[in-house]
Amino acid sequence: MFANMVSKLTSLQQELLSALLDSGVTKDVLLQALEDLDPSPSAFGVKLDSLQMSPSGSKLSDTDSKPVFHTLTNGHSKGKLSGDEGSEDGDDYDTPPILKELQSQNTEEAAEQRAEIERMLAEDPWRAARMIKGYMQQHNIPQREVVDVTGLNQSHLSQHLNKGTPMKTQKRAALYTWYVRKQREILRQFNQATQGSGATMLDKGNQDQVLLFFSEFSQSGQGMVQPGDDAAIEPACKKLRRNRFKWGPASQQILYQAYERQKNPSKEEREALVEECNRAECLQRGVSPSKAHGLGSNLVTEVRVYNWFANRRKEEAFRQKLAMDAYSGPAHSLNSLLSHSSPHHPQTSSSPPSKMQGVRYSQQGPGEVTSSTTINHHSSNAMSTSQSVLQQVSPGALDPSHSLLSPDAKMISVSGGGLPPVSTLTNIHASHHVHQQTPNLIMPLSGVMAIAQSLNTSQAQTVPVINSVAGSLAALQPVQFSQQLNSQHQQLMQQSSGHMSQQSFMASVSHSHMYPHKQEPPQYSHSSRFPPAMVVTDANSLSTLSSMSSSKQCPLQAW
């Protein structure tokens, strides 16, 4: 007898029996322990046989299935059955009310349900889990509903359905009980929708099932009422929540296709979509479209279609806003980064010239242009610091006869490479600025000397001078210009060409205001006479300028 029983056990159960025998327990003692555990050995054998039967092997009768439910409902589930191996849910699990209710019923329908549950318990747990999961997806049933009815842990239920995580037999029995009753309840809904007018679903024949699975209690302390069954036991569990409507994959496909055609359909179009969606939902469940009212809470209505389209339009508008923010964000952040990282920050024209740190110059007028600064870094062995070349635009109002950029006014070349020509340093674009700025010009020292020689002493001019020491701004002292500018011009240029080949080129922007013994800001008598000029020089040449004596005092201020 024992040998025949071993042949019907699973591999794990055989290992457990072998371990018991290896521990010193004899067969007689083990058989006596089994008889003491269950006074009906034949009933115990039936349970083991039922666990190994194939789904089509045989159908258990009501009398054969009662001992199993008797064991499950009376807490004798400590001895593991098939599917209990390695259960990760170690919490104690009281007998769920759904099992107690099914055990207490003596109707023919309850007997059929118990037989179906026994058959599922005998199957492979993973196969049964996949079957239940597919049924839930087909009918858009959330896991929360199963948790509310069976009392299972939702995490454990999800792992069992998705990954086949082992689950105790008592818990699987509760899950299978819900599955069997849910199948019958949905089938009853569709059948009654065909027989009746389909307008109402809460008739007295199926009110108990609807209250069980689609309960909408208004009172928190009220239990589930089943008027048609006097022997039913009221489950003392928490209040069941109403099922939330969930769009099925078939309906979503139809709605998305309609959204591509029309984002805001009319009422007639929405009603046509309702019929199409309900038809697809019925076909998904394997029932006739004429039974659409049997969908229950999953029935598609015109209001739900309207809300779906409204939500899609909101989502699309939100995505467009995010895309616009992402597009304009980098440009804004780049401008902010350049304005903070650059040593020169643009300011309005209301600031005094000595404190202006702007690198963009503009002026009003139809024929005037502006330029934005381009900073070019030239590294060389003979240059210890980077060179910052500030570009300014020659104004259109400047008289062409001055010939400031003549061949004799070339940029001073240094060892390791010369500066790029003025044409490559100048970026001319249209002026759209509101404030007015004095036009500026890049020119070498020779050009400044040539113009300064021909200036009238009664006219006040502005000459910005570039000078820098080790890449940092320095405040410059006032420079005295000699009246014999023409005589010292050639000497200055000869000295500057020699020093530039030995010393590093140092450049910054400074303003040199020339005015006849007055502290007021200079005023131009005519803007076309001489606009501000840019002087490019080195330290020794600047010292030569400072040594000149003249009645024109030119204080240099760091820009």
UniProtKB/Swiss-Prot annotation:
Q: Where in the cell is it found?
A: Nucleus
Q: Which UniProt keywords apply?
A: Activator, Developmental protein, DNA-binding, Homeobox, Nucleus, Transcription, Transcription regulation
The Swiss-Prot or TrEMBL record describes its family as follows: Belongs to the HNF1 homeobox family.
Locations of Low complexity compositional bias?
Answer: 334-354, 370-381
A GO molecular function term, named singly, is: RNA polymerase II cis-regulatory region sequence-specific DNA binding
- What are the DNA-binding region positions? 240-320
Where would I find the POU-specific atypical domain in this sequence?
100-195
Acidic residues bias located where? 85-94
What InterPro entries does the entry give?
Answer: HD, HNF-1, HNF-1_N, HNF-1_POU, HNF1_dimer_N_dom_sf, HNF1b_C, HNF_P1, Homeodomain-like_sf
**Xref: CDD domains:** homeodomain
What is the name of this protein? Hepatocyte nuclear factor 1-beta-A
Which tissue types show expression of this protein?
During embryonic development, expressed dynamically in the developing hindbrain, kidney (pronephros), gut, liver and pancreas; expressed in both intermediate mesoderm (precursor to the kidney) and the caudal hindbrain (including rhombomeres r5 and r6) at 10 hpf with expression diminishing caudally by 14 hpf. Strongly expressed in adult kidney, gut, liver and swim bladder; weakly expressed in brain, eye, testis, ovary and heart.
> Encoded by which gene?
hnf1ba
Subunit details: Binds DNA as a dimer. Can form homodimer or heterodimer with HNF1-alpha.
Q: Where is this region: Disordered?
A: 53-98, 334-384
TM region positions: none
Q: Which GO terms describe its cellular component?
A: nucleus
One GO biological-process annotation of the entry reads:
pancreas development
